[in-house]
Amino acid sequence: MTVREAGVLAIGAGPANLALAVAIEESGSAELADGTLLLEQSPDVKWQRDLLMPWARSQVSFLKDLVTLRNPSSRFTFLNFLHEQGRLDEFINLGTFHPYRWEFSDYLQWVAASLKRVRIQYGARAARVDPVLAEDGSVSGWSVLLTDGDEIRCRDLVVGGGRDPRVPEVFAGLPADRLIHSAQYRTRIAGIARDEPVRAVVVGGAQSAAEMFYALHENLPQSRVTMLVRSIGLQNYQTSKFVNELFFPSFVDEFHDSPAEVRAQVLDEMRLTNYAGLAPPFLDELYTMLYRQKALGPQRSEVRAMTEVVGARVEDGDVVLDLRDRLSGKTEPLRCDLVLLGTGYDPRKPALVRELAARVGIDKVEVSRAHRVRLGDAARGAVYLQGVNEETHGIADSLISVLANRSHDILADLLARRAGTGAGSAR
């Protein structure tokens, strides 16, 4: 086992921590940049690794990349990536603000490879985080134990690995080999023979569920696929330009300063902008596919709306789902081989963060405007949380839209604390 030191240790090398890495590298503080390390459990950087279908597109403008809204002249922009790849003319000719998901993922890997001072360690998974205490009992830093037994000690910790997948309780008793969450889709589907006549059921009514439903027809062409939607039917997410202003980085201040009950109401109203709808062009393509099946055959697929799963078990080698029709109230069984969950992510803070909070005696994790966990004025070491603060920073907190500006907020707080000037923007 080896013990190493870092000034800033960031868990995860996804978009959030890469945006911060770019901000740190461009900060002018060589000491801060040289002392920053990102840990990535995978062998490379991939964005939404298990939903990188060749036809899937980003739902966010390429101008909301890791840096443009903070520093449009940066060498780390998506447009500079295209220029260096020799595809800028062709991309402009596409006439779209929404690149393919694989292309944005390639951009992230390019950014990671282009960092000069900030380091990334691949194949490194954090197993546990413990506080390092000063003589007076205050938190002076953090000890991060990796799964390979190595330890990294740091002053400041940034957690940006995203939320944990949500598996509804009704499915908890199903064997792991019969259940696939969208976070595992491509990896798990690759292990099934392409010609297998699988009876698959997709649960969920938003983008990830619909993408799995669509992709199954290509990945398993002999499959029969049923999609279960609890709502009245699949629908577009809200695309109004007026509503989209709620994704402006400037809205974060207004949201953060509002009373908790107001924030909860706004989040509920904004649900259809992100969590409960589909991109309009993709929704049209999905409906067209089902129409072609009905007209030309074979009809392998169906979408069942106003249907909820109230029971799940294995019986005689089949997975049996008990489905309740919300209109009639009747319940009937549906037999299948495989259940795919587009059920999103656990709204709680990630397990790693909850465990860390327990070790420092925090019952409820609260963060400042600069995304720093409130540990008390005596703490020298800090923890910053990225992408899991919707209840205080708005629904865009989990999205790419605010990455560039959020990285500025965290950077300003890091620099202010090192300069001894207080909390910076961390009110």
Regions flagged by a language model, labelled:
Residues 58-76, 234-237:
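Short, solvent-exposed beta-strand-terminating loops
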